[in-house]
Design a protein with these regions (language model features):
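Intrinsically disordered, low-complexity repeat and linker tracts
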Residues: 1, 322, 326-381
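Short, low-hydrophobicity acidic/polar segments
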Residues: 1-200, 236-242, 248-260, 265, ...
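Short beta-strand segments
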Residues: 26, 42, 197, 207-209, ...
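Edge beta-strands of extracellular beta-sandwich domains
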Residues: 93-96, 300-302, 312-314
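Short linear, low-complexity motifs centered on an aromatic residue
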Residues: 186-205, 338-356
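Contiguous ligand/interfacial binding patches
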Residues: 199-250, 254-255
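C2-type phospholipid-binding modules
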Residues: 304-329
Length: 381
């Protein structure tokens, strides 16, 4: 993915504002009125936000609450801002649990993290992040890093910027014909071009996303953990009729292989589908390519469609693991059915000699005469 493509498109984000260094929610306290106690309002408790729109063409911009509400800092206190995106890897709004390091659900004052369970299908982009001030912003706060984020920091022009990191491994796919016959050449022959009808990768699908935590900063690989067995995730594509980049992906349309340069040794490279986002951390991923090819099975009949399948393994060196937040381009060389053409070559008879049988002699002992050697043609000087 190019930097130009790495822009927001109005995705749904979820945001927490927590008391600094803890899992406790931040509350805004309204002033007391006479004998009426001050009311407490949660500021951002798993609040739904919208990222900047695609029209903004930006990778960093102001996110807005989905319901249009405006929030304000409490008069005192410092706070942490956390954000995450689960796409549709959860049914409905995400349910976040407070847990300790052992994974047991506990009260907020005993919790060390907030987590949400997800299930991926290969199309979701799971992201998470925490706001952290830049060096320049810390300088604006008098080099007191603990003064963020707060009403004081806001007065100094320092507001939370949550950096969202991609937590899955991304595969994009290209295909090419490995032979001219695979691309349906020569035209009018007994086999048409192979079509790629599906691509799938085996990956774990059930995981737990850590959306906020206490303690030292965690690596991206530690924020999303997967359990259970792997299953096939199927490559999909964007709906060409829809301009909304957030619209659900649709089933892959068949892609015919081509070969335009007759002098080339390999077919044209063709992009297939959108991308597959899989659980990171594996050294290899089983890959299955579903194919079809129209072939003539009998002279005088019409061609029939033959389903084919090609299996492979996506790996670098078998030792290095695929990392979260990285996109890898996978180029697949495809081979279709090759017509069997049997050539018959007739070997001439070789003179084996003659056998003379005479009853006046012993009829059981014929006389064998070696064949006359063939005189080789003279070689002209």
């Amino acid at each position: 993915m190019t930097d130009a493509e790495n822009v927001w498109a109005g995705q749904t984000l979820w945001v927490y504002m927590l008391q600094k260094g803890s899992m406790d929610l931040a509350y805004y306290k309204a002033p007391a009125v006479g004998t009426t106690a001050a009311a407490e309002t949660e500021v951002f408790n798993n609040k739904k936000f919208n990222a900047p729109n695609a029209a903004d063409n930006t990778k960093s911009g102001l996110a807005t609450t989905a319901d249009g509400t405006i929030a304000y800092y409490p008069v005192s206190g410092n706070y942490d801002f956390w954000g995450y995106r689960v796409d549709d890897a959860v049914a409905g709004d995400p349910v976040v649990k407070l847990v300790n390091d052992a994974g047991d659900e506990v009260a907020a004052d005993q919790a060390t993290k907030r987590v949400v369970d997800i299930k991926i299908d290969g199309s979701q982009d799971i992201m998470a992040g925490k706001a952290a001030p830049s060096t320049d912003e810390v300088a604006k706060l008098g080099n007191y890093a603990d003064n963020f984020y707060s009403a004081y920091a806001a007065r100094k022009g320092v507001q939370p910027n949550i950096t969202f990191n991609h937590l899955l491994t991304r595969f994009t796919f290209e295909v090419r014909a490995g032979s001219k016959a695979t691309a349906g050449l020569p035209a009018g022959g007994n086999t048409d071009a192979v079509k790629v009808t599906g691509v799938s990768v085996d990956s774990k699908t059930t995981g737990t996303l850590t959306v906020a935590y206490t303690g030292e900063t965690k690596a991206a690989a530690d924020l999303l953990t997967f359990t259970g067995d792997a299953s096939a995730l199927t490559l999909k594509q964007r709906d060409a009729a829809l301009a909304d980049n957030n619209a659900p992906l649709v089933a892959l349309e068949p892609v015919s292989l081509t070969w335009t340069d007759d002098a080339a040794t390999i077919g044209d490279v063709i992009k297939v589908g959108e991308a597959l986002l899989v659980a990171p951390g594996q050294t290899e991923y089983p890959l299955t390519i579903a194919l079809s090819q129209d072939v003539l099975q009998k002279v005088g009949e019409t061609k029939v469609t033959m389903p084919l399948e090609q299996k492979a393994t996506i790996k670098m060196d078998g030792v290095k693991a695929f990392e979260p937040g990285k996109s890898y381009k996978v180029t697949i060389t495809v081979y279709g059915l090759e017509e069997i053409k049997v050539t018959a070559t007739l070997v001439p008879w070789v003179d084996g000699g003659s056998i003379d049988i005479d009853d006046d002699r012993n009829p059981n002992e014929g006389e064998y005469t070696e064949p006359t050697p063939t005189t080789p043609e003279p070689i002209e000087p």
